[in-house]
Amino acid sequence: MSMQDTLADMFTRIRNAQMASKADVTMPSSKMKVSVAQVLKDEGYVADFSVSADAKPELTITLKYFGGKPVIEEIQRVSRPSLRQYKGAGELPKVAGGLGVAIVSTSRGVMTDRAARAAGVGGEVICTVF
């Protein structure tokens, strides 16, 4: 049986690994997952990530903790396969009053809500991170 929502699986694996205080988490890789991992790294939510060069590439994300607590308090999928959420540049949500980020897939690539607003582009709201 094939997986329907691979990004939701990615976020669940990250949540579960952090609750178990794991140093890193491994999952099957895809271009979208690597793009999301890059945004999470750029925003300081994860320490690092790497992609293996196997026949079936795997994405390994090194999680980040501060004072023994996970840096990511909450990561939630917004747009899902059965209900896509598209927003214009002016309609992009501010997460936790601007303290968190929304990750958006735009025509210019995957970026944060702040970067999308600054570029004046909207897109599919993939998830929110706080």
Curated annotation (Swiss-Prot):
UniProt organism field: Marinobacter nauticus (strain ATCC 700491 / DSM 11845 / VT8)
Family listed: Belongs to the universal ribosomal protein uS8 family.
Any one Gene Ontology BP term: translation
Parts of the chain that traverse the membrane: none
Name of the featured protein: Small ribosomal subunit protein uS8
Subunit details: Part of the 30S ribosomal subunit. Contacts proteins S5 and S12.
Pfam families: Ribosomal_S8 (PF00410)
Function: One of the primary rRNA binding proteins, it binds directly to 16S rRNA central domain where it helps coordinate assembly of the platform of the 30S subunit.
Keyword Ribonucleoprotein: yes
Superkingdom of this protein's organism: Bacteria
InterPro entries: Ribosomal_uS8 (IPR000630), Ribosomal_uS8_CS (IPR047863), Ribosomal_uS8_sf (IPR035987)
GO cellular component: ribonucleoprotein complex; ribosome
GO terms, molecular function: rRNA binding; structural constituent of ribosome
Keywords: Ribonucleoprotein, Ribosomal protein, RNA-binding, rRNA-binding
